[in-house]
Amino acid sequence: MSFNKLESYSNKEVIREEVAILTDLLADITRNLLSPETFEKISLMEDLAVNSKYHELKAIVEELTTDEMVYISRYFSILPLLINISEDVDLAYEINHQNNINQDYLGKLSTTIDLISTRENAQEILENLNVVPVLTAHPTQVQRKTILDLTNHIHSLLRQHRDVKAGLVNEKKWLGNLRRYIELMMQTDMIREKKLKVTNEITNVMEYYNSSFLQAITNFMVEYRRLAEERGIKLDNPKPITMGMWIGGDRDGNPFVTAETLKLSATLQSEVILNYYIDKVYTLYRTFSLSTNLSETSQAVAEMAALSTDKSVYRENEPYRRAFHYIQSKLIQTLLYLKEGNFSNDGQRLTDRAEEKLSAKANLSVSNKGREIIPNYIQSRISETLTELKKEETPSYKTAQEFKEDLQVIYDSLIEHHGEALVSGDLTELLQAVDVFGFFLASIDMRQDSSVHEACVAELLASANIVQDYSSLSEEEKCQVLLKQLLEDPRILSATHEPKSELLQKELEIFKTARQLKDAIGEEVIKQNIISHSTSVSDLLELAIMLKEVGLIDENGARVQIVPLFETIEDLDNSCNTMEKYLSLPIAQKWIASKDNYQEIMLGYSDSNKDGGYLSSCWTLYKAQQQLTAIGDKFGVKITFFHGRGGTVGRGGGPTYEAITSQPLRSINDRIRLTEQGEVIGNKYGNKDAAYYNLEMLVSAAINRMVTHKKSDSHTSDKYERIMDQVVNRSYQIYRDLVFGDERFYDYFFESSPIKAISSFNIGSRPAARKTITEIGGLRAIPWVFSWSQSRVMFPGWYGVGSSFKEFIDEDPENNLAFLQFMYKRWPFFKSLLSNVDMVLSKSNMNIAFEYAQLCEDQNVRDIFNIILDEWQLTKDVILEIEGHDELLAENTYLRDSLHYRMPYFNVLNYIQLELIKRQRNGQLTPDQEKLIHITINGIATGLRNSG
């Protein structure tokens, strides 16, 4: 049975109506800010863009003064943003509406659980499933936080539109509020004046927990359990969704991530979740006014109530209230310990409760860096409670399990005394939240490049007089040295008095901090350590040496899992050899056994794409998962995958449900993790309804892929794979010949794109490259993809696809085309692969791309565009032929309509950006005027709804 995507139920008429309201308001606001002549130019440019009259549009843009471009750029940047808001509001409405009328849609949780409810292993699947979105700070969120805040205000107002039409909200007042926020947006800086710091990235992402994640995940957990129990499936402690975090722990190529940022990230996360608990417990305190005159309580609740510092005579007969007050006091005390950094050198929480620490600052509820994201009323409540805590000893919680046990005492008492209806709602939701978030909120991954680990280990071995030139050893010799240290030598190598390099000192501090945080907050706070550019077993063992230095690993077990990240095509091809050798090591088997026999492997989508092109990347990743899963089976290890996907197709992006359900069979062993980064976080999780829906998609897709056999005919399956091997090998050659084989390509890319402006754009704390860029290989994947998106070529998402498939078809035109069409209908991986290319092509614009090519001074370099254009046309023709359609996005009318609304406006921005780049290169722009290029980058990314 097939279902429609929820987006297909969107109300296009409502969206058009709301877009008309928003655009009229924006036009009226802009008219008041500009001269009649300049506003007339905006109207004309808008008309020309809608009617695709690019030549005339270009002529007008070339005549604009730089001052005129300021507000014109803002106007055409805000227009697509307002359209995005309208679409997001409609989607949020449909999520609620379709669920309320019990309408099935693709990925709906109830339908998915129905699918497996009759299976013998249904309970095992639902109990063990763990899907982990990992939030990263990869710099692709071009919007300032201030603009995002204004966006949220407009979103909230637009959600009232249906009530306005029904007469439930005053229309004049509503329009006035909308106008105010749009006018504020129009006159607010759209770009950051300074580069983000890691601390900014941490606090920014925490806002999503307060606005969406906490409520959405809690609601999802309650629904997950309810649906299972309704179908007779009893679950003990399921965790279908938990959260991951890279910000503060990912130091690969980012020198600004330190031990301090790791500590800040972990402690701020704990503050956020503890404040959430404090707020929820206070709500329960206000609600549970049950009197002993009218109801009974258990002895355990009575004993807890007696410990409360709430001695009001009005609550003498309200034991539940006093019990919740006691719990709240313990939570606040826990928060105070955490806030003041009460960790000793070995990581254990201090027990000193000196009077001055309790009375120091009434607003100690949150850190200075994070105070703004905690509601004021919670800070006030904590301040009031401090006085009580000073008067009488109140313990803190050492673990989240202790907190849950206290809540369970109240829950059990209510159930025992016929309070089934009372426990549903807030109390049940709070218990679910504790299961998922503990006191840590999200597990932080640590990540570093393998070359850094090698340099640190080489220094440690030399300082301890073990090996003086470790890096010169062969791979076999390295492994022998490392294994001897791990198995036979108990020494702490860093304990020598030899002076340490700045790099080694910094790395050791980070690992020490990780140990302290795990001891203080719990094991869940840091579970994985990822090794970028993993190429060998020694890369994994070098990290083990570093972990051993701080007591996070020994010969019997590991407190942190070592996770290799295979990124390039070559490394992915060699990953099976690396992992087979690693899994054969007895010590590695013990480490894995201490992690319930799961071994995670991270797969890099971005670098593999830049290395070999879209087809080669996707197919290499697909085969690697098949082969690595088989190697895990050989050693009795459950291999799980962490997908390092970006927002764009060129970095592994695309529709999430299809991406997961098209993974190889058996590639999801209970667990799957995937990165959510940059603009994707805001688009998917900007409000609790959208967050719930996207989490539902993740879990439903994972379950579907675990239980549904997509390719039952092994002969056909083998033929699929033989065809893919042939096509992909050719695609790889075509891609490499141009990107790395044509000496003109480097100049073409840097001259025909806004890469220099993107590299200076203040959208993240991390540099655009790991080192000075002298070749394409030295450029990070994000600015690489971002630049092609801006120039509207979308090169990483399709180049090499058309020629490789055309050559295969031409070998036997009638039969080969027919079989590719058969594969498209029958093989989810292949359909997802081509659908993503279809989507990327629909966002490209080769008329605009041609104009960017003209930025190249040398005609010989400009000629590269003709190669790209020929491949683009061939790719489009071949894709439509295989799909059996006459136009792009024939199967995704929602996106087609959405692009139809937005595309004319950000097309204008491309022409403005082109003119600005020309003026910049001719020395006609001041430094302040050059910032206009950043505004156009912002607007184009907003219109495309992705960047890097």
UniProtKB/Swiss-Prot annotation:
List, alphabetically, the Gene3D superfamilies matched: Phosphoenolpyruvate/pyruvate domain
User: Recorded E.C. number(s)?
Assistant: 4.1.1.31
| Xref: PROSITE patterns | PEPCASE_1, PEPCASE_2
What is any one of the record's Gene Ontology cellular component terms?
cytosol
Which GO BP terms apply?
carbon fixation; oxaloacetate metabolic process; tricarboxylic acid cycle
- Magnesium found in the keyword field: yes
Which superkingdom does the taxonomy of this entry point to?
Bacteria
User: Which reaction(s) does its UniProt entry say it catalyses?
Assistant: oxaloacetate + phosphate = phosphoenolpyruvate + hydrogencarbonate
Q: Which family would the database say this protein is a member of?
A: Belongs to the PEPCase type 1 family.
User: What name does the UniProt record give this protein?
Assistant: Phosphoenolpyruvate carboxylase
Annotated source species: Streptococcus sanguinis (strain SK36)
What gene codes for this chain? ppc
